Amino acid sequence: MIYTIEVQLDEGITADSELVERAAAAVLAAEQMPEGCEVGIRITTDDELHRLNRDFRGVDAPTDVLSFADDGHDSRFVVAPDQPRYLGDIAISYQRVLAQAAEYGHSPARELAYLTVHGVLHLLGYDHEQGPAEAARMRTREEEIMTILGLPRE
C-alpha cells in the first residue's frame, strides 16, 4: 500500500525518520486503510510536548506522544471524494524516546517505533483511556504491529 507519511524532525533531533515512516505505514497496512491516507508526524522536544499537552488537553505536564485526529467534520472545507484521506498529526518527544528506552531496557529505535505505532492507532480510533478492555485491545494491536516490524518485546 502507498501512504503519505510526512515526518518532521525538529532542529538538533537525530531520530530515524525512515523507521518512523515504516512504523506508521505498518499500522495503516495492518488496519487495512485505503491507499493515499496521509499522516503528519513531528519528532520534537519535551518542552514542546508539554506545551501541546497543556494547550490542547488541559494537562500541564510533559508526555511522550500526542495524536491529533482529523475527524473530517470541518464544514469550512470541501474535499473531493477522490482526494487522499488526511488522518491527522502526531507529536513525539525525542527526549522521552531516549529516557523510556533506557527505563524499559530496550533500544531507542524500538521505543520510537512503538510511540509511532501508538500514535497512529490513536488516529484510527483506538483509545486506551476508554477502559481496561479497550486498553488491552490497543496493547495487543501494538504488539502485533511491533512484531510485524521485527521489534517485538525483548
From Swiss-Prot:
One Pfam annotation reads: YbeY
Q: Which GO terms describe its cellular component?
A: cytoplasm
Keywords for this entry? Cytoplasm, Endonuclease, Hydrolase, Metal-binding, Nuclease, Ribosome biogenesis, rRNA processing, Zinc
* GO MF assignments: metalloendopeptidase activity; RNA endonuclease activity; zinc ion binding
The catalytic activity of this protein is classed by the Enzyme Commission as 3.1.-.-
Entry superkingdom = Bacteria
An annotated GO BP: rRNA processing
Q: Where in the cell is it found?
A: Cytoplasm
InterPro entries to which the protein is assigned, alphabetical: MetalPrtase_cat_dom_sf_prd, YbeY, YbeY_CS
The UniProt record gives the binding positions of Zn(2+) as 118, 122, 128
Cofactor mode of binding and number, as noted: Binds 1 zinc ion.
Which co-factors does it depend on? Zn(2+)
Family statement drawn from the similarity comment of this UniProt entry: Belongs to the endoribonuclease YbeY family.
Q: Which PANTHER family match?
A: ENDORIBONUCLEASE YBEY, CHLOROPLASTIC
NCBIfam families from the UniProt entry: rRNA maturation RNase YbeY
Q: What does this protein do?
A: Single strand-specific metallo-endoribonuclease involved in late-stage 70S ribosome quality control and in maturation of the 3' terminus of the 16S rRNA.
Protein name (database record): Endoribonuclease YbeY
Organism encoding this protein: Chloroflexus aurantiacus (strain ATCC 29366 / DSM 635 / J-10-fl)
**Source gene?**
ybeY
